[in-house]
Amino acid sequence: SDTTITTKQDTSGGIHVAGGGTLTASNLTVETNGESSAAIRSDRGGGTMTINGGTYTSKGTGSPAVYCTADITVSDAALSAENSEAVCIEGLNSLSLKNCTLSRNIPENEQNDCDSTVILYQSMSGDSEVGESNFSMEGGSLTSLNGGLFYTTNTESSFYLKHVDITYSPSNDFFLKCTGNANKRGWGESGKNGADCTFTADEQEMSGSILWD
């Protein structure tokens, strides 16, 4: 708790859980600068993370504020990704945000088939068990500086929003995109890699398109 963590190299996350581990953190100041370096991250075998308070910023390409292959709960924290999706959840895992600020700016990348703020997916890399991905956000704010908001592909997924103050990008490409993909990283077999999505909004204002196939 009450600690500053700064990383500068690629694949150097801020705080990390894997192999079924448990991590509890409070009031950290975390900044990562390399590629594939999420401020809050997990890896194979998952685990549990409980985070209360603090600031978590990722600045590198492909470095979300939260990369989730575990069960992660974050409350009363500021989360920001400057060159990536803000949140990536893969496979049978969950992220719960309560009274957090979440923002992101993602540059265009030819490997991506769309630009989103929160993505729930299955990469088939083996980093996570296949199953339903869960994202919930209550209170706080969500800011998108470009592209769309919520994207899910090649997985079962569920979203829950309540009382979130949303700032949309100027283009507001989509509110929710629930489709297959032709991603160059190989997220399932094209034509067979759609998403089965449940989206629940509770006393939530929303605007934008819903795309599905």
Which residues are covered by each model-predicted region?
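Surface-exposed loop/turn motifs in large extracellular/passenger domains
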Residues: 1-7, 17-35, 41-84, 89-110, ...
